[in-house]
Amino acid sequence: ISSYWKRVKQGCRAACMRAYDAGRTSVELQPWYALNAGGEAMNKPFENLTVLDLSRYLLGAYPSLYLADFGARVIKVEDTKVGDYCRQEEPQIDGESYYHYALNRNKESVSFNLKDPEVLDAFYKLVISADVIIENYRPGVAKRLGIDYETLSAINPRIIYCSLSAYGQNDPRSLSALHDVNIVTQTGYYDLTQGALALLSPADFAAAMVAIQSILTALIQRGMTNRGAHLDVAMYDSLVWWNAMLDSRWFFFGKDFPSSKREYPSIGYN
């Protein structure tokens, strides 16, 4: 087992260096989790899927990255003015953001002004042959642009449309511009870190993982019904679900426990 993980680590490092030397996203990376027990590359289960990624930042980019790593054709639809905001993130190498390339490897990119009727028609043509759409606009924005689920499912009834937001599509709180730190605070996640700022983005990652699971479930369902679905993924709900084991303490005991108390001695090494 140790030799297997050593090969995995070496392979990941080599792949990342090849990506950097060859212009990063122009090269195809083999993710470590796509290796079988013998260290050989697995077949790509999503190579017949087309994904349109309308999202910005980690929240939507991570689910489409997962699909891309396993063979899906992911077309990232970016704004004509600034593109994905990830492109501006620091630190950068030669004017290129590491954050952008870490999240958007193995993806194609197109710049669309979806407010232009002619461009919108071109986008609709992509929808006809697409399988999955991912977006993280604030509720109502997609409808104003004419790219909401109702509109696009009329073009392609098999489309799986994943909407990511802070509290869900029907909660008015999602109309505000909220970020990971807001959700982490409101769900009580900072109790785990005793108020220290999380090094990663727990709410973003939690919602991204729920989105991946929801998309995979919808693909299985579509195989049985030949119909798509609208997936409503909320960051708040996802992080609460992620913390289910810890949050349940309140319901069972009516109190919290000191952060130093290990409730599960058998996993005390974590």
Give the positions of each predicted feature.
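Acidic, glycine-rich segments within the central catalytic cores of soluble metabolic enzymes
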Residues: 43, 170, 176, 180, ...
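Phosphate-coordination loops involved in phosphoryl transfer and adenosine-cofactor binding
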Residues: 46-48
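A structured beta-alpha segment of the ubiquitous adenosine-cofactor-binding alpha/beta core
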Residues: 52, 98-154
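N-terminal Rossmann-fold NAD(P) dinucleotide-binding loop
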Residues: 60-61
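Glycine-rich phosphate-binding loop and adjoining beta1-alpha1-beta2 segment
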Residues: 69-106
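N-terminal Rossmann-like NAD(P) cofactor-binding subdomain of oxidoreductases
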Residues: 116, 135-191, 205
